[in-house]
Amino acid sequence: MIIVDRISEMQALMRQYHREGKTIGFVPTMGYLHEGHAALIDRARQENDIVVLSVFVNPLQFGPNEDFARYPRDFERDRHIAEQHGVDVLFHPEAGEMYPGPLTVQVVVKARTDVLCGRSRPGHFDGVATVLTKLFHIVMPDRAYFGLKDAQQVAVVDGLIRDFNFPIELVPVPTVREADGLAKSSRNVYLSPQEREEAPALYQALRAAAAAVDGGERSADAIRRLVKEHIEAHTHAEIDYVEVCSYPDLAPLETLHGTVLVAVAVRFASARLIDNIILELPKAHRQED
């Protein structure tokens, strides 16, 4: 495995791979890798000649009161996991390499950001889109892999790739979960023992929503109520949002139809967790993510 921390070196290496006719799969991360990231790497490994993993905690996507300083970091652990899962190139730039001075140009996301996490995190997806635009130009991948746990991010990346004509295939990968259903997340380490015990209620609520839809429920209000009441009954968390919207456009719905995202975010004392489920209507089939 090659470890690179300079943009110029990374671009030269990627050009070499392209000259050799090799396909490149890219997994962008902020590090502190877990089984969810490993699933992205494994999928990329199956589908490409070269797998590139980036580990970069992007300051642009953290708000003024968010956890940039305390976001978990352990590069040696990340390096070991990357090597175990067959990563060819690990790109690990410092913030000063990615942002050597004040930005002259920044990507501003105009749609799909006024709901879900975007509503309470102004500027977050602008930061995500800006760093991904830079990374896509640096890595020049054929495919980019993202976890559906952050379905809004996947929707934003879908728009970024389409609107900026990046020659990249977006590959969404289903959420990896603990045995009790809790979505894998780097932020799970912040949970207290009691919060960790309560946290699977998020996915239980989403599964209850899916069961209600399978049973014929089509009211978005009814689904929101069901999810909210389940979480309130089984956790001490503060609910940030429960949303029912179209996917990937993230338009609000009154009546469920087409591809529907049911998404939830809650705040425990020291961690904010998100989860979602994607439903395909009118068929009873559903894709759990």
Swiss-Prot record:
(R)-pantoate binds at Q61, Q153. Keywords: ATP-binding, Cytoplasm, Ligase, Nucleotide-binding, Pantothenate biosynthesis. CDD domains: PanC. Pathway: Cofactor biosynthesis; (R)-pantothenate biosynthesis; (R)-pantothenate from (R)-pantoate and beta-alanine: step 1/1. The keyword Signal does not apply. It is found in: Cytoplasm. It comes from the Bacteria. The active site is at H37. It catalyses: (R)-pantoate + beta-alanine + ATP = (R)-pantothenate + AMP + diphosphate + H(+). Its main location: cytoplasm. It is an enzyme of class 6 (ligase). Belongs to the pantothenate synthetase family. The reaction proceeds by a bi uni uni bi ping pong mechanism. Catalyzes the condensation of pantoate with beta-alanine in an ATP-dependent reaction via a pantoyl-adenylate intermediate. This is Pantothenate synthetase. The lineage of its organism: Bacteria, Bacillati, Bacillota, Bacilli, Bacillales. The gene is panC.
